Regions:
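A glycine-rich beta-to-alpha transition motif near the start of alpha/beta enzyme domains, typified by
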Residues: 1-112, 142, 152-161
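Short, solvent-exposed secondary-structure boundary/capping segments
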Residues: 113-120
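Anionic-ligand binding region
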Residues: 126-141, 149-161
Length: 161
């Protein structure tokens, strides 16, 4: 079995190409848990399995966390996957088009080691909440594949020096 390991913004990912279907999808979760196990294997934050596209993309990606659970998509992983597609000649043009359960993710090489991706637009909920004594002025709940929350506090506001 051939695989590649990439690092993006501090996250490590293992990439498997399964374009020929030689690996049964039922094995993906167990492979993720085995390959991503730190200190006893390759070690990674997640496994991305590439399959033939189903809806006009360059490939379809299935993402598995290190414990074998699934996620719709991962932004840092998608950037690594764009690099992989570029380096392996898997993209049909200058833009890499990756099908994910969260929707189509597109990426473009902007420098030798830099890739920019376009994610789905997150949903936004503006709230004023207090969390453990910190008053938050803004909370964004987005789901670009894996649920995320961004909290800006008074400390995050720009200040003049």
């Amino acid at each position: 079995m051939h695989f590649w390991k990439y690092c993006g913004a501090g996250n490590d990912f293992v990439i498997l190409e399964n374009f020929d279907g030689s690996i049964a999808p039922e094995r993906y979760a167990a492979l993720a848990a085995a390959l991503c196990r730190e200190h006893f294997s390759v070690g990674a934050d997640g496994l991305m399995v590439l399959e033939p596209p189903a809806q006009g993309g360059d490939c379809r990606m299935r993402f598995y966390n290190r414990d074998g659970s699934t996620a719709e998509m991962c932004g840092n992983g998608a950037r690594c996957l764009c690099r992989h597609c570029h380096d392996r000649g898997l993209a049909s043009g200058p833009v890499q088009r990756i099908e994910t359960p969260a929707g189509l993710v597109t990426g473009r090489r902007i420098a030798a080691d830099r890739y920019r991706i376009r994610l789905n637009r997150p949903s936004v909920v503006r709230l004023h909440v207090e969390a453990e004594g910190v008053r938050c002025a803004y909370l964004e709940l987005g789901e670009p594949g894996i649920p995320h929350a961004v909290v800006l506090t008074e400390l995050d506001r720009p200040r003049a020096e």
